[in-house]
Design a protein with these regions (language model features):
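Hydrophobic/aromatic beta-strand patches that form the interior of the parallel beta-sheet core
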Residues: 30, 78-80, 144-146
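The conserved 3'-phosphoadenosine-5'-phosphosulfate
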Residues: 33-43, 86, 134-138, 142-196, ...
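PAPS-dependent sulfotransferase catalytic core
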Residues: 1-54, 204, 211
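Conserved nucleotide-sensing/catalytic segment adjacent to the nucleotide-binding pocket
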Residues: 45-77
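Short alpha-helical
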Residues: 13, 65, 87-88, 152
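PAPS-dependent sulfotransferase catalytic domain
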Residues: 23-27, 43-45, 49-52, 68-149, 154-159, 163
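Short His-Asn-centered micro-motif
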Residues: 8-9, 33, 59-63, 83-84, ...
């Protein structure tokens, strides 16, 4: 049985890349796991502990907020704090979430969306990272700090987990360049369908006139 691994870095710190890496190593991964009820605290712990009994690895919301409770309930677990520079992080958060309100984010930050609330989000992000480091300061065998966006990957992750280093590259998922490619693909097909429709309509009109 795999040791439980909790990713406790905030979203937009390469949590999806971490999930793909853990999955490649054979872990059963879950997250993000959302609760849409505005009274989120009433449901999140029950949901999290139920999932914790079914999976090996966990990332994104709500796991970063629950690390103390998870440590007490699963004392032999390992924790991974993914992070990145605060200015890079907030740009990514704003680009991704903008003004979209979510109960989960309101529970974490006190306000439901980052746009216009950048200082609030950065303060919460930096406080979380400081508190995690303080909490695990005498237990380095249980906490790995990993900056995937700066190029860290298998060579830090695998020794920490006691896994062999794979010969494949470390996964890089949900990057800005990937999202831009997806946006272009999604915008390409409506244009293509419109052009095809116009051409067919023009041929039909020409055919009708010829008759």
């Amino acid at each position: 049985m795999k040791t439980k691994v909790f990713g406790i870095g905030f979203h937009k710190t390469a949590t999806t890349s971490l999930a793909k890496a853990l999955s490649y190593l054979g872990y059963r991964v879950t997250g993000p796991n959302w609760v849409d009820n505005p009274n989120i605290a009433e449901e999140v712990y029950e949901m999290a502990f139920e999932l914790a009994n079914r999976f090996d690895a966990f990332q994104d919301n709500p796991w970063p907020i629950l690390y103390k409770e998870l440590d007490r309930k699963f004392p032999s677990s390992k924790f991974i704090l993914t992070l990145r520079a605060s200015d890079e992080w907030i740009r990514s958060v704003v680009n991704h979430f903008s003004e979209k309100e979510m109960p989960m984010r309101e529970w974490i930050y006190g306000v439901g969306h980052p746009k216009g609330n950048e200082d609030v989000y950065i303060a919460r992000y930096e406080r979380h990272n400081r508190e995690v480091l303080e909490y695990f300061k005498d237990r380095s065998e249980q906490l790995l700090v990993l900056n995937i966006t700066a190029g860290e990957g298998w060579t830090k992750l695998c020794p920490f987990l006691g896994e062999h280093i794979p010969s494949v590259g470390f996964p890089r998922a949900n990057t800005a360049s990937e999202r831009e490619k997806l946006r272009k693909r999604e915008s390409f097909w409506p244009r293509r369908m419109y052009i095809t429709f116009r051409r067919r309509a023009k041929r039909l009109m020409t055919s009708s006139i010829a008759r």
